[in-house]
């Protein structure tokens, strides 16, 4: 073969090799392109990297907030005397004869009152040194120091709306409020409201002399309740009403109590008759028509010395009142039965049984048996009243 032909063959061989290399490069590029396009069309769930997976949010479980508030209430506390009474047998003299001083009056019930969350009473006296009396049959007073007896007795609030708060006119009224404020005892009634938080729950305490059913008074009562309900408060009203020595409420008491509950009140507590009256359940709320006397300096030896401590255990779920527990603790206004020593004392044995039996007889609209154990009323239940 000529040198010329050999060169041509060698050249053709180089061309063929180059063409083959070009072909291989094209095939490789095509495969890479196909793989890239295929990867771009993968579904999201084909990505197996769990770190990039967005999981749905799980809401934390919300626990209900449950709260209980224990309220105690007692009746007429006339911590004073009338100047016409025999001083030797009077309430002030009794404490002076004891080593307990001002702690004497509530020493036999303090074990109960100190274990609740709040205790209220009807304060039916004045704390004043004024001698300018109102023109009436009885005028009760004690010096301002006697307000200490309330604090020592674990009483946090008092109703001052009654027929003895002005026994020594406006001066006596103002002196009484000043004495209470000095001892940090809250008061309500006669234009004052007591609003407070107890264990985070809102409470409003109101007091009135409840002998009137005229429109002006009812409108005022309705407005006072409405203002408290705007703050989701439990509304507790004290009414000084009824007839003395009457064991059953008169029609006006029932009408006023029902009106108050119809407009949002939760518990109604009554006093003035100086004896106990029945308890009523109305629209899943509670009315105690008369708590009777308690620490009562208005009589050195009343024939009926029975009384009781009214207690209500209020249960809340998420700041809403869901049930009202009711019980009574039978007491006597005196630690002895032959006179009034002005020292309320728990009853036991037959005396306790007899008081509970009598109170149930008087409470024909209670809807449950009243005892010293709590009975709970569901406030959210549809009422049949």
Residue map of PLM features:
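Acidic, metal/ion-coordinating pockets
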Residues: 2-3, 19-23, 31-385
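Electropositive, gly/pro-rich neighborhoods at or near active sites that engage anionic ligands
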Residues: 26
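N-terminal Lys/Arg-rich, disordered targeting/topogenic segments
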Residues: 1-17
